């Protein structure tokens, strides 16, 4: 009961979180309105940036798992998109938020795996190289984008496995959406005009976004879609295919894996296609499985490969790899021959991170640097970074082999796929090293290789007693 001199309201001190929320609610709208009225175009852009920063900060502090889910969708569907209204790469912005959230908030998993140790060693050696060779802002900017894309692997492995598997499924669905869109563009809009509808995300700004492969004097359009570069598309779709088989089941897995494999074939990326083939061969050689499952898998992939080769452009692309007239093979041979000369005097820390040939196709053609991920890591960051990158490959291959010995073929598929990717794609192409979005896709592949290993060895971490990225809830105040 209230005494006669008491009020029906009681003042409760506002905690810091609520004070910050109140300040944002009051200050941000006033400042945004001021910029919109008096700032002109720069002011409007600044206003949009401020709103985005405020919203992103709020989500990161109060609902950080939304960041991981948004990152999964963006990396799968819009890997080269930009934040609307702000010229900032979408996956880099979200990736930075995910990394920061994993530092600020309590994580779901505390243990560190061997795969993460190898990634951390790569980060340390790469940091040494940029400190030794960095001479301009672009060097540190490129290193920063690579760093965020690589740290995502460590941050995602801090998540509870249920949340991490949700991340993987979102990535698969988003990549499948991007694959379907790319197929529509390839079949019905070879000029690539449909991609202009994604202009709010920075797509469609190039005068000519279509990519070709030339064979026998004829030009064939390659599938790229929102991945822009067909080789980057091949890698992104390869990762999605691995996750699709690992995480999905039944008809959904069958339908989306067929879509992803078909789109991967249409990229005409030999590195990605041969990685799948190599991985399946390893799975069939080392995986213990029932005869029925083995027959179904052999029949399914044989039918898929025959269907792919029935397309003349695909058949020509595949078999030209083994001929002496393949221009790509000749260029790779010349680049390997020139590699020691490029590295003379730069073996320890490399030639630098912000070099023109990494960003300008014309300069890349003139320099003709090695299209080999481990050697390109040496070219950019020196022998220490190259050895650390090779250590990531070796540790991943060991984990992959353990997955191959699992009783479940889904684990063997991603284990063999990772080994195949390292043996084929990383030796024939370089986007994993030079393109941040593709670097992040490789980080995701490493993450789910670890997840498959945990399941294959019954070593899944117990995260039920820990809340990931959990912000503290306000303490209830008892009022007498």
Task: List where the protein language model places each region.
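Hydrophobic transmembrane alpha-helices and their immediate junctions
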Residues: 252-253, 281, 285, 293-294, ...
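Alpha-helical transmembrane segments of multi-pass inner-membrane proteins
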Residues: 127-128, 168-268, 274-285
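Interfacial loop-to-transmembrane-helix boundary motif in multi-pass membrane proteins
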Residues: 67-68, 111-122, 155-201, 408
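Long extracytoplasmic/lumenal interhelical loops at the membrane interface
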Residues: 314-381, 396, 400-406
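Transmembrane alpha-helices of multi-pass inner-membrane enzymes
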Residues: 414-424, 430-480
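A membrane-periplasm/extracellular boundary helix in multi-pass inner-membrane enzymes
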Residues: 180-190, 287-324, 340-345, 478-479
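Helix-loop-helix junctions and helix-breaking kinks within/between transmembrane helices
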Residues: 38-44, 82-90, 135-145, 228-234, ...
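N-terminal hydrophobic segments of proteins, predominantly signal-anchor/transmembrane helices
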Residues: 58-151, 409, 419-424
């Amino acid at each position: 009961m209230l005494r006669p001199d008491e009020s029906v309201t009681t003042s409760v001190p506002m905690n810091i979180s609520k004070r910050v929320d109140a300040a944002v609610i009051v200050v941000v709208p006033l400042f945004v309105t001021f910029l919109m009225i008096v700032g002109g175009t720069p002011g409007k852009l600044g206003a949009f940036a401020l709103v985005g920063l405020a919203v992103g900060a709020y989500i990161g502090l109060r609902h950080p798992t939304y960041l991981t889910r948004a990152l999964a969708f963006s990396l799968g569907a819009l890997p080269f998109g930009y934040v609307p209204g702000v010229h900032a790469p979408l996956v880099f912005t979200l990736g930075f938020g995910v990394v920061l959230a994993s530092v600020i908030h309590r994580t779901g998993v505390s243990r560190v795996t061997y795969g993460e140790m190898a990634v951390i060693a790569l980060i340390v050696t790469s940091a040494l190289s940029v400190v030794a060779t960095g001479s301009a802002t672009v060097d540190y900017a490129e290193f920063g984008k690579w760093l965020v894309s690589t740290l995502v692997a460590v941050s995602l492995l801090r998540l509870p496995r249920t949340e991490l598997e949700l991340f993987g499924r979102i990535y698969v669905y988003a990549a499948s959406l991007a694959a379907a869109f790319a197929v529509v563009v390839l079949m019905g809009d070879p000029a690539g005009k449909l991609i202009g509808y994604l202009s709010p995300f920075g797509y469609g700004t190039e005068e000519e976004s279509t990519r070709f492969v030339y064979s026998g004097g004829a030009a064939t359009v390659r599938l790229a879609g929102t991945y822009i570069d067909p080789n980057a598309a091949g890698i992104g779709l390869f990762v999605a295919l691995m996750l699709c088989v690992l995480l999905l089941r039944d008809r959904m897995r069958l339908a989306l894996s067929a879509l992803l494999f078909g789109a991967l074939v249409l990229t005409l990326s030999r590195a990605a296609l041969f990685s799948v083939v190599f991985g399946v061969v390893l799975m069939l050689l080392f995986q213990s499985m029932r005869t029925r499952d083995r027959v179904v898998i052999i029949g399914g992939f044989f039918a898929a490969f025959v269907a792919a080769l029935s397309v003349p452009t695909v058949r020509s692309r595949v078999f030209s790899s083994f001929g002496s007239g393949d221009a790509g093979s000749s260029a790779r041979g010349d680049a390997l021959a020139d590699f020691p000369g490029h590295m003379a005097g730069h073996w320890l820390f490399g030639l630098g991170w912000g070099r023109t040939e990494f960003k300008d196709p014309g300069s890349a053609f003139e320099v003709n640097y090695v299209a080999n991920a481990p050697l390109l890591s040496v070219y950019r960051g020196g022998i220490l970074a190259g050895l650390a990158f090779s250590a990531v490959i070796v540790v991943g291959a060991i984990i992959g082999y353990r997955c191959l010995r699992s009783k479940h073929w889904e684990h063997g598929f991603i284990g063999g796929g990772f080994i195949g990717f390292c043996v084929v794609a990383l030796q024939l192409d370089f986007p994993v090293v030079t393109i941040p979005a593709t670097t992040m896709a490789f980080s995701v592949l490493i993450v789910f290789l670890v997840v498959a290993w945990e399941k294959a060895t019954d070593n899944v971490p117990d995260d039920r007693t820990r809340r990931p990225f959990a912000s503290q809830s306000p303490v209830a105040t008892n009022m007498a």
